[in-house]
Amino acid sequence: MIISKKSLPRRTFLRGVGATVALPLLDAMVPSMTALAQTPAAPVRRLGFVYIPMGSDISRWTPPGESGALTALSSTLSPLEPVMKHVTILSNMELRNAYPGTHATSNAAFLSAAKAKWTESSDYYLGTTVDQIAAQQMGQETQLPSLELSMDLMEVVGQCDNGYACVYQNNLSWSSPTTPLPSEAHPRVVFERLFGEGGSSADRRKALGKRASLLDWVREDIARLQKQLGSADRSKMTEYLDTVREVERRIEKAEAQTFDNPLPDLDRPVGVPAAYEDHAKLMFDLQVLALQGDITRVITFQLARETSNRSYPEIGVADPHHPTSHHGGDPEKVAKIAKINQFHVSLFAYFLEKLKAVPEGNGTLLDNALYLYGSGMGNPNIHNHVDLPIVVAGGAAGRVRAGRHIKYSEPAPLANLHLTMLDAVGVRLESFQDSTGKIDTLYSPVGLAG
C-alpha cells in the first residue's frame, strides 16, 4: 500500500482531563508516497496468551488426520470453523517441567517452561515467562509494556496445591524468577488503565455518579482531528470510538446495581458482569481495543484458574469444573468436560472473529497478531502434561503460516513453540528452557527475514 498525503504521527492521542485515548492505525499516519512497510506506521506484531485450566478431553479435541493442512476440526474445536484458516493445532506437545503433575505447576510452567520451586512460603522461584521476555523488547514503544488479565479474583494466599504456594497458580506472568505479575479481572479497572489518565477516586466517583462517558472528556480533540482526516479515516476513527463507548456501556450496565447504593472504593471497583460469558467477552473486547490502539502489544489472559470450582449452568454443566475433571472414565463426566472445553473455545473464537473484523494496513488485526491458547495440563483425570490442548492463531504480520495441523509422533517440548513464537514477533533467543529447536512448519514459506 502506498498513500499520498501528509501524515499524522502513529502515536496520536485524543486527550482531555482524566482521559487519553490512543487511536488505531489510520491511512493518514502513512507518510506521503511511502510504502506502508517502510514507515513507523507499518503494522506491528502483537503477542498474546490465553490459558484454560485442567486440560481437556483430548479424544474430542484432536482434529482428524495427520500433519498437514487443517481441513476439518474436532467437535470441541468446531467453534473455530469461521477462522479455521487462521489457526494451527499442535498435537502431542509436552510441558516437562510441570511435573510432578499438579495444578499449580501446570499454570506456572505454561509460559515459563520452568520448574517451580516446591514451597508454600514467600521464597517461591520460577522463571521469566515468555510474555515478559517479549515485553522487554516489544513494550518499549507502548503505553503499557504488557497487560495481565484474568477472570477470577486472585486473593487466595499460602499453600494452594500439594505444598505449592498459591502464587504459582494465581499468576501466569513473571517478570523475573521471583516477581509474579498480578492480573486484573475487573473490566472497569482495565478500561481505566487503557484510557484513563490522572484523577482521584473522588473524581471517578463523581463521574460515575453522573454516568459520564470517558469520551466526553476528549470531545474537543475528536472534533479537531476529524477536520484533518479523509472520509475513510473519519469512518475508521468513529467506528473505533463507538466500540470504546459500547464497551464502556457494558461496564456501566454491570455496575448499575451499585448506583443505588454507596459506591465502594473505586481503586478496586466492583461491577463484574454476573454471567461468565458476558464477563469473558468483555475482557476479550478490552484486549481488542488495547491491541487496536497499540496501547500494548503483549497480553496474557487466564480464562479460569486451576482448581476452579466454577460451574457452567449456561451450557448445561451445573457441576463444578475441578471435581468433574477427575472423571475416572465416567462417560457422563467426560462429556461435561468436553462441553466446558468447547465453551471456552467458543469464547476464543469470538475474540478471533473480532480481531479479524478490524482492518489494519494491508490485512487485519488478526493477521498481525499471534496468540497461543491452551493449558499446561493434558489429561486432568491423571494430571499429566503431555498431549496438551494447544491452538496458535494469527499470522504475525506474514511470519506464520496458519491453517495447519502439526502432529508430533513423539512428545515435543512446549518451549519449542514459545521459542518459535518469540522469533516470529522479532524477539531472538537461541533457546528457551528445555527447547530443542524452533518449529519450522509453523513459519510462513515467505520467510522470516527482518
How would you label these PLM feature ranges?
Residues 1-450:
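Ligand-binding pockets and gating/stacking loops
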